[in-house]
Amino acid sequence: MEWSLTQDKLLAFHRLMRTDKPIGALLLLWPTLWALWVAAPGLPPLWILAVFVAGVWLMRAAGCVVNDYADRKFDGHVKRTANRPLPSGQVSEKEARTLFVVLVVLAFLLVLTLNTMTILLSVAALALAWVYPFMKRYTHLPQVVLGAAFGWSIPMAFAAVSESVPLSCWLMFLANILWAVAYDTQYAMVDRDDDLKIGIKSTAILFGRHDKLIIGILQVAVLALMVVIGRLNGLNWEFYWSVLVAGLLFAYQQKLIVRRDREACFKAFLNNNYVGLVLFLGLAMSYWS
């Protein structure tokens, strides 16, 4: 029986860290890989690559824990989140705080194997990961903070590989923020009615009936910035083909969200994984050739 309880607790931790739902980690991973490949240029040193891949999964898990901790009093009132480990009592608040600290310490131990510039930048990464979940109480733009949190691995990657943060780094960081606002607005459209009832703020609420148009504008801006990054770094035609495919995926997402159906909006959000993957493949093939 004791073993069963332990197994149940581990399963609850597993759900709290969202290791059963990798989409968030993938949306964090792709921009990290973009940055590593552009900074190298090409295949980065294998240890640095391993540190960042492991760091992505650890910090995404930590972000999910602190997000659920921040939302623990709200999640019970939302149908989609009512059964999460914290509001359902499967994990205590103390256990969640302890798990967050363990994950952050493990991630920081990995960062300590890198250069000083990267270590210093990692402090901002922790601050963004902690602050983001609480922003939805105070501003309609928490998605901007999410974009900064998900994108902070970009300057860290450039710093780790080249000990510099050039213009391409910050353009990529900006592109990631715009992309995150677009895809997380799609995600927020799923919960918009519930969020309005409990007082949670989001860009989906802020944009209102202009949500689809603004998402489209953001997506076009992302593609334009990626083209500029390609030009600055002398990338080959393979990369520009990937930008075109990403544009087609964005068009497909626009089709999905046209009626603002919850399931379709969530499907559009998930589709962004392929956008990140396609752009990474374009970068990798461009440097390979």
Swiss-Prot record:
Its main location: membrane. Catalyzes the prenylation of para-hydroxybenzoate (PHB) with an all-trans polyprenyl group. Mediates the second step in the final reaction sequence of ubiquinone-8 (UQ-8) biosynthesis, which is the condensation of the polyisoprenoid side chain with PHB, generating the first membrane-bound Q intermediate 3-octaprenyl-4-hydroxybenzoate. It comes from Enterobacter sp. (strain 638). It catalyses: all-trans-octaprenyl diphosphate + 4-hydroxybenzoate = 4-hydroxy-3-(all-trans-octaprenyl)benzoate + diphosphate. It is an enzyme of class 2 (transferase). The gene is ubiA. Coiled coil: none annotated. It holds the Pfam family UbiA. It is a multi-pass membrane protein. Pathway: Cofactor biosynthesis; ubiquinone biosynthesis. Keywords: Cell inner membrane, Cell membrane, Magnesium, Membrane, Transferase, Transmembrane, Transmembrane helix, Ubiquinone biosynthesis. GO terms for molecular function: 4-hydroxybenzoate polyprenyltransferase activity. GO terms for cellular component: plasma membrane. It is found in: Cell inner membrane. Its cofactor is Mg(2+). Its EC number is 2.5.1.39. This is 4-hydroxybenzoate octaprenyltransferase.
